Structures are given as structure tokens and as C-alpha cells.
């Protein structure tokens, strides 16, 4: 707080809070409150305390914020329904551009599960959209999988290793 005052800056009290975060936050939180340490949201990510895969050392982990995840899924679903009449090849090509953009922003360390879940939901929405186009040309799930082999969707990938 003193540092902010030095530069004539103020925090909005209703939007700010102090939380215990760091190496000993998990142990202290379990001892004091009997639960996991608090998390915070920033720039579409939820930051939480975790441990590294190879060692038991403290590690800051990020995952896609639940609210942003739902908003992005809803926007993608609406986009698919708006563009359901374009040819499949073009639809998948444009959808891949959107998917890669999502992966590039949210593809950070420890977030592969969330971007994988995003792809899973997008695949289901695409299946529904393609089956709404015409009852004569609707896909079975096996036919849809074959179509995805011909026009594959972009796979999730970690683009930035933060920690």
C-alpha cells in the first residue's frame, strides 16, 4: 500500500483484497480454516497454489477462469450456429483459426486440461451444427469422426511455459 501511495495510486477497495498466497499458504490454510488456500482471477485466468509435477515444491498454477470459459464457449457456439450454412471444409478452417487463437492465449503451463475441455465441447457443438443443416446429410458419430479425419480440428497445445 505504501508503494502505491508513493506513486499517487489507489486501490478500489471493493475490487481488492489481501489473500495469503505462496509456499506456506496451503499448510497455513489447512491448519487455520481446514480448506484449500484462496485463489484470485486476473486476465481470464484463475491463479492458485499448487505443487510441481516432478518435485513437491510450491508452484503458482493457472487455469482458465470459469466465467471466461463459459463466455468463450457460448460465443463459439453462437458463431457455429450463425455460420452453419458454409461448406464443411471452410467452416472447419475458420473454426481452427478461432481454436488456435484460444490455445495461444490460454495455452499456458498447467492449463492443458481446460483447453482440452474447450476442444471437447467445441467438437460436440460442431456435431450438432452439422446435423442441423439437412436431415438427409446428417452425420452419425462414426461418420463425424471420419469427417474429422479428413478435416481435423486444431489440437490443444501449451504455447507458453511460465513456471
Describe the residue ranges of each PLM region.
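Non-catalytic terminal/accessory segments
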Residues: 1-163
Amino acid at each position: 500500500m505504501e508503494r502505491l501511495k508513493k506513486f499517487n495510486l489507489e486501490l478500489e477497495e471493493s475490487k481488492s483484497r489481501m489473500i495469503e498466497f505462496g509456499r506456506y499458504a496451503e499448510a497455513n490454510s489447512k491448519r487455520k480454516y481446514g480448506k484449500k488456500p484462496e485463489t484470485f482471477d486476473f486476465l481470464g485466468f484463475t491463479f492458485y497454489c499448487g505443487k510441481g509435477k516432478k518435485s513437491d515444491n510450491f508452484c503458482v498454477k493457472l487455469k482458465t477462469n470459469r466465467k471466461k470459459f463459459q463466455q468463450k464457449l457460448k460465443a463459439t457456439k453462437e458463431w457455429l450456429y450463425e455460420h452453419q450454412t458454409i461448406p464443411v471444409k471452410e467452416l472447419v478452417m475458420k473454426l481452427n483459426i478461432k481454436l488456435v487463437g484460444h490455445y495461444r492465449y490460454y495455452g499456458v503451463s498447467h492449463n492443458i486440461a481446460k483447453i482440452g475441455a474447450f476442444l471437447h465441447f467445441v467438437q460436440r457443438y460442431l456435431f450438432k451444427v452439422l446435423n442441423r443443416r439437412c436431415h438427409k446429410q446428417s452425420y452419425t458419430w462414426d461418420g463425424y469422426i471420419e469427417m474429422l479425419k479428413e478435416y481435423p480440428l486444431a489440437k490443444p497445445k501449451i504455447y507458453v511455459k511460465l513456471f
